[in-house]
Amino acid sequence: MAIQVSTEILEGSVLALLTKEDYYGYALTREVKKVFPISESTMYPILRRLKKEAWLSTYDQAYEGRNRRYYKITDQGLERLNQIKSNWQELKTATDAILEGNNEE
């Protein structure tokens, strides 16, 4: 995909995945990579920002002698996801109108 993906779309994708199950960072990056070209060095700042905004929380769980940090969506995160979905629908509708030549004023 050659289109630049906005931070809001990446945040929404992360939050949407976390509505299904909790993920640790690497697994979450792997899931997002299935759709968007993203590196761990891009993902972790997004996760920190989402946590700072209280849109997700974290907990540690032992795995093979090490701790994995898992991310979990919060109620505020669900609200933010709904806002992102609404913004996306508005953008999609406007973009579709332009691309299909239906942008009447």
Task: Briefly describe each language-model feature range.
Residues 2-44:
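N-terminal helix-turn-helix DNA-binding core of bacterial DNA-binding proteins
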